[in-house]
């Protein structure tokens, strides 16, 4: 029974925390497989065409030179097919080995050796930190941490570095790199109903207007917006209205379209689609884990205005995490536990809660430890009471 519960907990942990660890390399493998299939099918069709042409030529009385030329063409196409097949298989093999490496790493979680389990947990923490740093844009720090911890094969650095190139190009107000990324992932972006490529084409149109290249803008619109429909058609109509206004217009909505802040919106849109493409959440696993941990121990006592009930051992009570945990829900506790303010021990039948005349409750063992001459001093109010005045508290 315990083994089944442990397996169930591990399965839940993998689904919640380790999903990106396996999903990203799997999606990469899937993408490379589809690309390899297309490349091999295309090159095979080329070989088939030149072979058919050779057979057609041989059915007559061809000259030797023409046959040699056709044979050279067949050899060339076969060489290209072989090269493309080898490259595709190598790329697939790399992705498959990466998936296997990560699966083997996750299996180490159930090790019976405490030392091995401790090392695995440390690596998991490092992996979370690397991903969080990558999301925050600290690429060099993330790469150094991954290299130092020996987890380069266990984190999705390549995906984030590719995203970095795209984002940097958008910051330079260039669309070519992002459009190339859209082309590489065209089929999946279409299934996601992504509007990123359309937004990029709109921005290119806006930049042509900004440069006062209106004829080029019209040609651009005819080329890329002829198939627009629905909400996209409304955006096209709005953008086309810019042709009648100067680049420095103060009339809305054309002033808003010319706002350079649109490039920042494109970066945000790219990030959103990139995460969706790899089935990642908008927040890092580190952020989600930290929030879950803070919420699990957050109580109303952590936010008392006088600060008298705050515990130095409570992470939520600390200054650095108190504000971060403020919007999070309180801990769910089906059965309450009373904790002594003096010792931090749980008050139960072996350490019954005792109430002083001023209404403050402490554990019996703690009152014994601070009793002097049959008197106790309340740590909160500094009032002095006889030990016999403390009354046992009963919880219904």
Swiss-Prot record:
Marked site, Essential for ubiquitin ligase activity, at 314
Q: Give the GO cellular component terms, alphabetically.
A: actomyosin contractile ring; cytoplasm; cytoskeleton; cytosol; GID complex; nuclear matrix; nucleoplasm; nucleus
Give the reactions, separated by semicolons, that this protein catalyses: S-ubiquitinyl-[E2 ubiquitin-conjugating enzyme]-L-cysteine + [acceptor protein]-L-lysine = [E2 ubiquitin-conjugating enzyme]-L-cysteine + N(6)-ubiquitinyl-[acceptor protein]-L-lysine
SUPFAM superfamilies on file: RING/U-box (SSF57850)
Which Gene Ontology molecular-function terms are recorded? actin binding; ubiquitin protein ligase activity; zinc ion binding
Tell me which residues make up the LisH domain.
Answer: 121-153
Give all residue intervals belonging to the CTLH domain: 159-216
Where, subcellularly, is it found?
Answer: Cytoplasm; Nucleus, Nucleoplasm; Nucleus matrix; Cell membrane
Top-rank taxon of the source lineage equals Eukaryota
- Any matching Pfam family: CTLH
Q: Where Phosphothreonine occurs along the chain? A: 28
State which tissues express it.
Detected at macrophage membranes (at protein level). Ubiquitous.
Zinc finger motifs (RING-Gid-type), residue ranges: 314-381
Extract the ranges annotated as region (Extracellular and involved in cell to cell contact).
1-124
Q: How does it get modified post-translation?
A: Autoubiquitinated as component of the CTLH E3 ubiquitin-protein ligase complex (in vitro).
Enzyme Commission number(s) from the entry: 2.3.2.27
| Keywords recorded for this protein, A-Z | Actin-binding, Cell cycle, Cell division, Cell membrane, Cytoplasm, Cytoskeleton, Erythrocyte maturation, Membrane, Metal-binding, Nucleus, Phosphoprotein, Transferase, Ubl conjugation, Ubl conjugation pathway, Zinc, Zinc-finger
Self-association or partners: how does it assemble?
Answer: Identified in the CTLH complex that contains GID4, RANBP9 and/or RANBP10, MKLN1, MAEA, RMND5A (or alternatively its paralog RMND5B), GID8, ARMC8, WDR26 and YPEL5. Within this complex, MAEA, RMND5A (or alternatively its paralog RMND5B), GID8, WDR26, and RANBP9 and/or RANBP10 form the catalytic core, while GID4, MKLN1, ARMC8 and YPEL5 have ancillary roles. Interacts with F-actin.
Q: What does this protein do?
A: Core component of the CTLH E3 ubiquitin-protein ligase complex that selectively accepts ubiquitin from UBE2H and mediates ubiquitination and subsequent proteasomal degradation of the transcription factor HBP1. MAEA and RMND5A are both required for catalytic activity of the CTLH E3 ubiquitin-protein ligase complex. MAEA is required for normal cell proliferation. The CTLH E3 ubiquitin-protein ligase complex is not required for the degradation of enzymes involved in gluconeogenesis, such as FBP1.
Task: Provide the domain comment.
Answer: The expected RING-type zinc finger domain is highly divergent and most of the expected Cys residues are not conserved. Still, the protein is required for CTLH complex E3 ubiquitin-protein transferase activity. In addition, the conserved Cys-314 in this highly divergent region is required for ubiquitination by the yeast GID complex, suggesting a direct role in catalyzing ubiquitination.
Q: What is this protein called?
A: E3 ubiquitin-protein transferase MAEA
| Naturally occurring in which organism (per UniProt) | Homo sapiens (Human)
């Amino acid at each position: 029974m315990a083994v089944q519960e442990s397996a169930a907990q591990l399965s839940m942990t993998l689904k919640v925390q380790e999903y990106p660890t396996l999903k990203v390399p799997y999606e990469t493998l899937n993408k490379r497989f589809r690309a390899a299939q297309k490349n091999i099918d295309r090159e095979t069709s080329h070989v088939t065409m030149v072979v058919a042409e050779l057979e057609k030529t041989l059915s007559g009385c061809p000259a030797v030179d023409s046959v040699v030329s056709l044979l050279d063409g067949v050899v060339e196409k076969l060489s290209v097919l072989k090269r493309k097949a080898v490259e595709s298989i190598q790329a697939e093999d790399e992705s498959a080995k990466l998936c296997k490496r990560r699966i083997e790493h996750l299996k180490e979680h159930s090790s019976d050796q405490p030392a091995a389990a401790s090392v695995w947990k440390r690596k998991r923490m490092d992996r979370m930190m690397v991903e969080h740093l990558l999301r925050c844009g600290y690429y060099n720090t993330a790469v150094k941490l991954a290299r130092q911890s020996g987890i380069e094969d266990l984190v999705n650095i390549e995906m984030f570095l590719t995203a970095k190139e795209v984002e940097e190009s958008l910051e330079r107000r260039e669309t070519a790199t992002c459009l190339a990324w859209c082309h590489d992932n065209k089929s999946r972006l279409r299934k996601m109903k992504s509007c990123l490529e359309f937004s990029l084409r709109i921005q290119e149109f806006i930049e042509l207007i900004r440069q006062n290249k209106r004829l080029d803008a019209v040609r651009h619109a005819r080329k890329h917006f002829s198939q627009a429909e629905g909400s996209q058609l409304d955006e096209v109509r709005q953008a086309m209205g810019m042709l009648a206004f100067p680049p420095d217009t103060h009339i809305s909505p054309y002033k808003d379209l010319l706002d350079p802040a649109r490039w920042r919106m494109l970066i945000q849109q790219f990030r959103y689609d990139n995460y969706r493409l790899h089935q990642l959440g908008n927040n890092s696993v580190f952020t989600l884990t930290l929030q879950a941990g803070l919420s699990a121990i957050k109580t109303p006592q952590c936010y008392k205005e006088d600060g008298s009930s705050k515990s130095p051992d409570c992470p939520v009570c600390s200054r650095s995490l108190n504000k971060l945990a403020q919007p999070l829900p309180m801990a769910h506790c089906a059965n309450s536990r009373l904790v002594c303010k003096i010792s931090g021990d749980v008050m139960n039948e072996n350490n019954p809660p005792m109430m002083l005349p001023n209404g403050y409750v402490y554990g019996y063992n703690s009152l014994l430890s601070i009793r002097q001459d049959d008197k106790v001093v309340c740590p909160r109010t500094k009032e002095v009471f006889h030990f016999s005045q403390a009354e046992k508290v009963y919880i219904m």
